[in-house]
Amino acid sequence: MDQIVIRGGQRLKGRIPISGAKNAALTLLPCALLTDEPLTLRNLPRLADVDGFGHLLNQLGCSTTIEGSRPEDFGRVMTARATTLTSTVAPYDIVRKMRASILVLGPLLARAGEATVSLPGGCAIGNRPIDLHLKALEAFGAEIELASGYVKAVAAGGRLAGGRFTFPVVSVGATENAVMAAVLAKGTCVLENAAREPEIVDLCNCLVAMGAHIEGIGTETLTIEGVDRLHGATYRVMADRIEAGSYACAAVITEGDVELVGAKASEMEATLAALREAGATVEETKGGIRVAMAGRAQPVTLSTAPYPGFATDMQAQFMAMATLGTGASLFTETIFENRYMHVPELARMGCDIQVKGRTAVVRGVDRLIGAPVMATDLRASMSLIIAGLAAEGTTEVNRVYHLDRGYERLEEKLQAVGADIERISAG
């Protein structure tokens, strides 16, 4: 099994290209199931989850071709075409590896009138049920059955009727599934208290490019007027705001100066506000965002919240950044339970972190010491990388397959801005 070895203490300085967003790509790929014409996605990141989703599309009868598959290529281009769906079943052996696989449920139901999808896997960061996905689809006319670890959904007459659904709590995945299901409904579908993440805006814009009728994009109320068919399109995947924020935290903890090329400030305002709270210089550039730090980070008080609040996917990285800060930082995790699994691993490096329920207090220490650590999930693994970049000595990060699910060519990007980091392959 691969590991990443970091010899810390190097100040990061230079330009880091930000890849296409993993969370957007995994939402845009299932759009190919909604039409029999080609959907071409540009700026697609080279990630294990993206490759896995492509395999799932193949299983359902969707052909895929990829340009830019050489190791040195950034921003791959995938063309997917589902001329005829050969299956409406997403099997356990694929879905168990990747939670985002549940996002084929809505498109299959919309296109074929039925779908059978295994209950999902993915990161082990607590209980993430799909009940809101199913309730939204039921509100649009679907009949849902759960049996033997699978969800079976059927649209009476082969097509959803339409309807109105109010999310009792904001859910990104459920909003995405419901929007994709609604675009081919017979009537109008209204989603209230919908998630507003930039990735959902990206999804809606792609669907509109394919001929969908969606009003209220970027707001909490989405009105989707169903159409008879969608056509193909060419669409560029948005930049990854979580990747950009992760490298920003790395710049701060190493007292560095980096430009995040391709990042958009308008899509990550809460992250940038938190960086400024920590004392970083943050400014927009012609090509992205510059983040620079002189001295140790100031204490921050952060509580995760649905967009436009502070993203739960940035919590672990900011916690790592705060470990060498000047005082005590307070973190409250409101989205997922059990999302502090990185804390024991950070403690191995000398971090002072106390967790009580959903709250964590991070007291800055004068130094971190490199140690062997183990990644537990995608964002937790990045927090270990960030801490390792600033630690004295050598840090060995194990189970890096978690990183490969969400960070494209991480070692190469960090090496280019001065980090002493390498991947050691097993065997």
Swiss-Prot record:
Its main location: cytoplasm. Keywords: Cell cycle, Cell division, Cell shape, Cell wall biogenesis/degradation, Cytoplasm, Peptidoglycan synthesis, Pyruvate, Transferase. UDP-N-acetyl-alpha-D-glucosamine binds at R99, R128, P129, I130, D131, L132, D313, I335. It catalyses: phosphoenolpyruvate + UDP-N-acetyl-alpha-D-glucosamine = UDP-N-acetyl-3-O-(1-carboxyvinyl)-alpha-D-glucosamine + phosphate. Its EC number is 2.5.1.7. The modification 2-(S-cysteinyl)pyruvic acid O-phosphothioketal is found at C123. Pathway: Cell wall biogenesis; peptidoglycan biosynthesis. GO terms for cellular component: cytoplasm. GO terms for molecular function: UDP-N-acetylglucosamine 1-carboxyvinyltransferase activity. It holds the Pfam family EPSP_synthase. Phosphoenolpyruvate binds at K22, N23. One of its GO terms (biological process) is UDP-N-acetylgalactosamine biosynthetic process. It is found in: Cytoplasm. The active site is at C123 (proton donor). Cell wall formation. Adds enolpyruvyl to UDP-N-acetylglucosamine. Belongs to the EPSP synthase family. MurA subfamily. This is UDP-N-acetylglucosamine 1-carboxyvinyltransferase. It comes from Sphingopyxis alaskensis (strain DSM 13593 / LMG 18877 / RB2256). The gene is murA.
